Design a protein with these regions (language model features):
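NAD(P)+-binding Rossmann beta1-loop-alpha1 motif at the extreme N-terminus of oxidoreductases
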Residues: 1-60, 67
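Rossmann-like NAD(P)(H) cofactor-binding subdomain of soluble oxidoreductases
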Residues: 80-133
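Interdomain hinge/lid region at the active-site interface
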Residues: 208-279
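A conserved regulatory-domain signal marking ACT and ACT-like small-molecule sensing domains
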Residues: 283-312
């Protein structure tokens, strides 16, 4: 059974959801949180915090713990890693993070002195909601959780982290930091920018007439993540700029192919558009094929509900 002391540095949606799951299962884990005074007070009201500290109290929160999870925005994670470089601890402390980019974070983590052990991490979970008020103990169920351990690190050295991830219902995937960043640029970061650009570039005439209210499900689905906050995404784009640019260039190439095919209609271009749609169909279907981890795939479930108050 999981036991020990876990310290969450930053206590937004993801950290509070982990704490909620731990509390709901009554695991013998001591939860320590590091955050602003307002958030610490709210976490105590919700029963999530056994101990709490301010960010500046690094001498206190870095000691007396088995696992430190850095759960703040990426640039703040880098600041916290720099602060930890100045701390000496007597026994091993595993340090991980939930940042959406890994190369720069893992380089900073590698500068920690033993017995700190840094394992870069990134759970593919979350939403456009950002605070502990939206905590969800089931948030991590069936999610992939990327880990980037230093080469030669035995899994036993970070077993508490792996056990916590398994308890939360996620599946560990080991990745090299650079490979992670290139992959997630395509699967997460570039789609965010496309969604943001789509929602932010509606024609002025359309907006002046309030025609955006006629948007169908497709537009609403494609722009849901346009509600995401700039502060978090600023850090992601600053630390994964090159990979995101490469992904955007690849996407732009696809859009250009659509433009070229449309431009040739009606005399030509029909076959080209047919192939573009076939390629899109195959790409979408590939999401639901068995995955590279234990043969798991995704499933799409549609639930028809009557549109009236109280249905959900």
């Amino acid at each position: 059974m999981l036991s020990g002391h876990v310290t969450f540095v930053g206590f937004g949606l993801l950290a509070s959801s982990m704490a909620a799951a731990i509390r709901a299962s009554k695991l013998p884990l001591t939860i320590r949180i590091v955050s602003s005074q307002k958030t610490r007070e709210r976490a105590k009201e919700l029963g999530f915090a056994d101990e709490s500290f301010g960010y500046e109290e690094v001498e206190s929160w870095a000691r007396g713990t088995d696992l430190i999870l850095l759960c703040s925005p990426i640039l703040h994670i880098l600041e916290m890693l720099e602060s930890l470089q100045k701390i000496q601890v007597e026994s091993q402390v595993v340090v991980s993070d939930i940042g959406s980019t890994k190369a720069e974070i893992c380089k900073a983590g590698a500068r920690l002195s033993s017995p700190f052990l840094f394992i870069g991490g990134h759970p593919m979970a979350g939403s456009e909601k950002r605070t502990l008020e939206y905590n969800d103990p089931s948030l991590f169920e069936n999610a992939y959780w990327f880990l980037c351990p230093p080469k030669g690190t035995a899994p036993e050295e970070y077993s508490l982290l792996s056990e916590l991830i398994a308890f939360l219902g996620s599946r560990v995937v080991l990745f090299e930091p650079e490979e992670h960043d290139a992959t997630i640029a395509w699967l997460s970061h570039m789609p965010q920018m496309v969604s943001t650009a789509l929602a932010g570039n509606l024609p002025e005439d359309l907006l002046n007439n309030n025609y955006q209210h006629f948007a169908g499900r497709g537009f609403r689905d494609m722009t849901r993540i346009a509600a995401s906050g700039w502060n978090m995404w600023r850090d992601i784009l600053l630390t994964n700029r090159s990979a995101v640019l490469n992904a955007l260039a690849g996407f732009a190439k696809g859009v250009k192919a659509v433009e070229n095919a449309l431009d040739k209609l009606p005399t030509d271009g029909d076959e080209a558009l047919h192939k573009i749609f076939e390629s899109g169909n195959k790409g979408r279907a590939s999401l639901f094929a068995p995955g590279r981890v234990a043969g798991h795939g995704f499933y799409e479930v549609s639930v028809a509900l009557e549109d009236r108050p109280g249905t959900i």
